[in-house]
Amino acid sequence: MNTADITAYMQNVGKEARAASRALAAANTGDKNAALMAIHDVLKNAKQDILSANKIDMDNGQKNDLDAALLDRLELNDARFDGMLQGLKDVAALPDPIGEVTDMTYRPSGIHLGKMRVPLGVVGMIYESRPNVTLEAASLALKSGNAIILRGGSEAFESNQAIAKCILEGLKKVGMSEYSVQVLETTDRAAVGELITMTDYVDVIVPRGGKGLIERISRDARVPVIKHLDGNCHTFIDSDADPEIAIKVSVNAKTHRYGTCNTMETLLVDEAIANELLPKIAEAIVKADDAMQLRLDDKAQAILNDNTTLKGHLSAATAEDWDTEYLAPILAIKILSGIDEAIEHINTHGSHHTDVIITDNYTKSQRFIREVDSASVMINASSRFADGFEYGLGAEIGISTDKIHARGPVGLEGLTSQKWIVYGHGETRA
């Protein structure tokens, strides 16, 4: 399609989405859940078609030299497919936030007022790799009464179109508008430019992908954006940490999965326990993955450089390492004087995503969660828990590190807003 065709195509997509959003806003919980379960059934029967489409994408990705992190996100295997099916059930089982009325109060004037939760309207989502996001985002949009326009990456085109076919069939089975969920049928980047500027038809944009994509969307969008740039997550091992917990959590936070935004990228260790505990943590992390590379500040080098178990896994950290989301088996390690320096380092170099303290000291734990300026702050738990499913939100449409509207994992409630409702009996303002 040429530029004029793309503009016309996107304008039509936007108009249909706006019309569908009005019908969805009026849909009851039963109708929305029926749509989710109809999509579940169609998807389950189309497993081989979807996995075959994904294999085409994976083969193309390997031919095009996609990096390991992107290939990991792109892949759909049996476990991830089953997770997609379960995700639909989980979202259907969640309480419906739409229509919830809170904070009802009487005013001296005689009016009775409160707040009602309502859909945002039309959500535009732009994302890379992860074809399961297509289904997760669609399910959350439907349950929260929003229409959604989905633009996946070209590397996942075949997978996304196969999933879109199932969504469309499921919607038709229950008589819901086929425009409630639209997966764009073009990989032309001009479509993204149109989507993020269609203020008449789109109420919010949610980008998920690399830092370059997020920065471009944030810079060029005229529609409000819910976003996070990257996931430079920290774990701080305090002087009062339980050694067993420190080792276990550090290994999980770094090695559980590399291509995710809640993976630990920097390990901070209090100097009071570094000599004793850091070698044990480092050895455990390298044992979990022999490909691991540890990038050390001067103090960490002094402790670890003579460790024969870690030979071939160590190098000196540079200033850039403290600001880097690796998405790879690379971990930066820094020795600090204590919690003051840890909080300062995290707030200076972190991405305000998820940060962790390992400590048995209640006072320090409470100070950490108050003063660290991140969307999720954890005590004695892996940063990998920063996830919509783990937080009980069902699927998540993304994670926001912004402070306005939604922060942290964005589930159903993050796709809604509140309007004031007022009941009266003929009251007039004096």
From Swiss-Prot:
Its main location: cytoplasm. The keyword Cytoplasm applies. It catalyses: L-glutamate 5-semialdehyde + phosphate + NADP(+) = L-glutamyl 5-phosphate + NADPH + H(+). InterPro entries: Ald_DH/histidinol_DH, Ald_DH_C, Ald_DH_N, Aldehyde_DH_dom, Glu-5-SA_DH, GPR_dom. One of its GO terms (cellular component) is cytoplasm. The keyword Amino-acid biosynthesis applies. It comes from the Bacteria. Its EC number is 1.2.1.41. GO terms for biological process: L-proline biosynthetic process. Keywords: Amino-acid biosynthesis, Cytoplasm, NADP, Oxidoreductase, Proline biosynthesis. It is an enzyme of class 1 (oxidoreductase). It is found in: Cytoplasm. Pathway: Amino-acid biosynthesis; L-proline biosynthesis; L-glutamate 5-semialdehyde from L-glutamate: step 2/2. One of its GO terms (molecular function) is NADP binding. It holds the Pfam family Aldedh. Belongs to the gamma-glutamyl phosphate reductase family. PANTHER family: DELTA-1-PYRROLINE-5-CARBOXYLATE SYNTHASE (PTHR11063:SF8), GLUTAMATE SEMIALDEHYDE DEHYDROGENASE (PTHR11063). Catalyzes the NADPH-dependent reduction of L-glutamate 5-phosphate into L-glutamate 5-semialdehyde and phosphate. The product spontaneously undergoes cyclization to form 1-pyrroline-5-carboxylate. HAMAP family: ProA (MF_00412). This is Gamma-glutamyl phosphate reductase.
